[in-house]
């Protein structure tokens, strides 16, 4: 069986589908080859009577994520705000503390200085890193050879700050601090708008969700493309030795095109044979960028009882014994299907896969009962979870991470074409990489690279800025005068030391002038 078209897209996630739609809209014939029995990739919306619909994969959108908002609106989708009306909870050392705002408050003055310096330093270091080429940062190699654990050991003076910083890394990239490059993580946070934007619900990356689920983005593009989207077609071979590119699938089908877009996580490239072989750096890159580990858990209740206690459902939970590190309210906008969404992250995900689904649910409910101080948390009516570690056509979630030393050596080839193969996927984005926004940016950029290759657009139109969403405008992230100018703990100690020396000198001079020194 032979199928000819202009472009073959490997991977039917949001990035691949966005690429296919743009090319289709420009009049090119496209075939999408998807390994799974569904489109959506790392977005996955299920429907049943208990949940109506629920996103078990990528779900959240917010201000400055203008491409996914534009595409979704074009497809007829609407957003709703994640509930953050009531108070948030910070659970640490067995106690719950209510707060408002993106970060838990700190009352110890020394810890506060340390805490403030942590976020300020990460944002300042991020400003030194180019979003489109992090390997060009002035101190790229120094930062890349350092793990985030090593960087946090340098920045943080108090255990409290180090622990919340570790949770921040776990939550942002579903990996441990000793696993990721400092350069890569600082870049990752920077290209998401900084520490406050990436972690926030209101005015941040988790502000909104799509009514009906994020899986509809890919599903509605599939409806547009029709039978040009082929499911259960894992690609096993790409041959560029002839005039056209020949692609073979696991079920022995042959497809032929002028160009190919690879819209899969880099590591899944190892499942595909290439003729001729991939260039050396590309061949090694795909063996060196694993995906994070996460289990997404949705616990359903009769009603959102936490709201009656003036809690919004957001919980920041510290402690090795706690299976969940972070939660959000996942109740439907009409108040139905009351639920708490929680992430089991990084090493905890790898540890808790040994338990049964029922055992994980019990641990979650016991934790929520303790954090919320409510026995109602022990009475779930339904439970859904998705262990992304077991997905052979994802390899994990949310995104691929770069261990120390990899970004500066191999980063340049991440989206560098190989012959007639162009690369998409959220990992190749320069803005909100790791999110649906990054997936759309990458897919449309790869599509425009092909449009340029065939002479339809000039080179300077490959990368295009996106107008701000009218429906979801962004408010600027601002810091107070104190947040900008408070010293770090070492800075305070130096200041106190200098003050002590100056005071002692002044007192000595005064005593000398008054003749108070005794001469022997």
Curated annotation (Swiss-Prot):
Site location (Important for catalytic activity): 156, 365, 382
EC number: 1.4.3.21, 1.4.3.4
Residue positions where N6-acetyllysine is found in the record: 52
InterPro entries (UniProt xref): Amino_oxidase, FAD/NAD-bd_sf, Flavin_amine_oxidase, Flavin_MAO
Cytoplasmic membrane side: 2-489
Domain of life: Eukaryota
Residues recorded with modification S-8alpha-FAD cysteine: 397
Cofactor(s) named in the record: FAD
Residues where N-acetylserine is found: 2
GO biological process, one term: response to xenobiotic stimulus
Catalytic activity: a secondary aliphatic amine + O2 + H2O = a primary amine + an aldehyde + H2O2; (R)-adrenaline + O2 + H2O = (R)-3,4-dihydroxymandelaldehyde + methylamine + H2O2; a primary methyl amine + O2 + H2O = an aldehyde + H2O2 + NH4(+); dopamine + O2 + H2O = 3,4-dihydroxyphenylacetaldehyde + H2O2 + NH4(+)
Membrane-spanning residues: 490-516
Membrane topology: Single-pass type IV membrane protein
Keywords, sorted A to Z: Acetylation, FAD, Flavoprotein, Membrane, Mitochondrion, Mitochondrion outer membrane, Oxidoreductase, Transmembrane, Transmembrane helix
Recorded consequence of changing residue 199 to F: Increased affinity for serotonin and tyramine
A GO term, aspect molecular function: monoamine oxidase activity
Compartments in which it is found: Mitochondrion outer membrane
Function statement: Catalyzes the oxidative deamination of primary and some secondary amines such as neurotransmitters, and exogenous amines including the tertiary amine, neurotoxin 1-methyl-4-phenyl-1,2,3,6-tetrahydropyridine (MPTP), with concomitant reduction of oxygen to hydrogen peroxide and participates in the metabolism of neuroactive and vasoactive amines in the central nervous system and peripheral tissues. Preferentially degrades benzylamine and phenylethylamine.
Family affiliation: Belongs to the flavin monoamine oxidase family.
Full protein name: Amine oxidase [flavin-containing] B
Protein species of origin: Rattus norvegicus (Rat)
Gene: Maob
